Swiss-Prot record:
PANTHER family: HEAT-INDUCIBLE TRANSCRIPTION REPRESSOR HRCA. This is Heat-inducible transcription repressor HrcA. It comes from the Bacteria. InterPro entries: GAF-like_dom_sf (IPR029016), HrcA (IPR002571), HrcA_C (IPR021153), WH-like_DNA-bd_sf (IPR036388), WH_DNA-bd_sf (IPR036390). Negative regulator of class I heat shock genes (grpE-dnaK-dnaJ and groELS operons). Prevents heat-shock induction of these operons. One of its GO terms (molecular function) is DNA binding. HAMAP family: HrcA. Pfam families: HrcA. One of its GO terms (biological process) is negative regulation of DNA-templated transcription. Keywords: Repressor, Stress response, Transcription, Transcription regulation.
Amino acid sequence: MLNDRARILLKTLVERYISEGEPVGSRTLSKHAGLDLSPASIRNIMSDLEEMGFVASPHTSAGRVPTPRGYRFFVDTLLTVRPLDQVSVNHLENSLAASDPQRLMTAASTLLSDLSQFAGLVMTPRRNPAFRQIEFLTLSDKRVLLIIVTMEGEVENRVIVTEQSYSAAALTEAANYFNQNFAGHSFDHVRSKLRDELGRMRDDITRLMAAAVDAGTQALDASQDNVVVSGSRKLLDVEELSSNMRSLRRLFDAFEKKTGLLQLLDQSRSAAGVQIFIGGESELLPLDECSLVTAPYSVDGVVVGTLGVVGPTRMAYERVVPIVDVTAKILSSALSQHK
């Protein structure tokens, strides 16, 4: 698509713009590109790049800036990623030593933000939706506590408001039935199987089990997915983002609600390594003026979540990419040791 001279000039323009934040003119390109070209030849090539949509000319400047298409070509074809310096690697390894998983998620998010100086994101691991054991306890006349032990050994509680009171024996009978027949399965699986079973059971037990399935599903779904966000306020220091308060509000709203971020990070789980979304590629409106660099992390080789950095499209990709990549690998190692 582009000849060698055009590639070198585009690479130089993107690197200078990322470094300086100002539109890049032909004189700067002539100085830094290392090509024996006249200013007129450089202007002609830049005009061609503009026609192809790789660069654009701001109205207030004679220089040019990269477009999202220009950034994409740069990232896919021209980017030279630098290894993460050993000081940063050591800091990551020391900070992400085997620990409680939730603490590791928070630490990883903070480290991503500190090292990149942008916002760090970590999608918490997908929990196994199955349960190991359940138990019913009477709270009052028509209130029953459902206790769920997950396959990871974590405990979730939900209060069920019943239409009638239940004896301790009835609650034990219902719990035993659940545990003997469905331990190791999800509540969705239980729901599908119970359709056939409930017709052979007493109505009072039927109602209790149906209520337990609904409550259990809600309990595990509520704690299923989350995104830990750190350092979002650092984006206030990015001029091209802070100058548009409307876009900035949308971005911070996305950080708070997290639903769109979850969907985007979830899509990245299947990526083989680092993935970069530039501007509108994320299809998430609040990120239209941002780039998102993500990588999946795993436990014993099984992908369980995604982490990443959100920053401006004018970010130092050659530095952010290894930060995200190395953090994902070190977090994977720490989680595998902790399990």
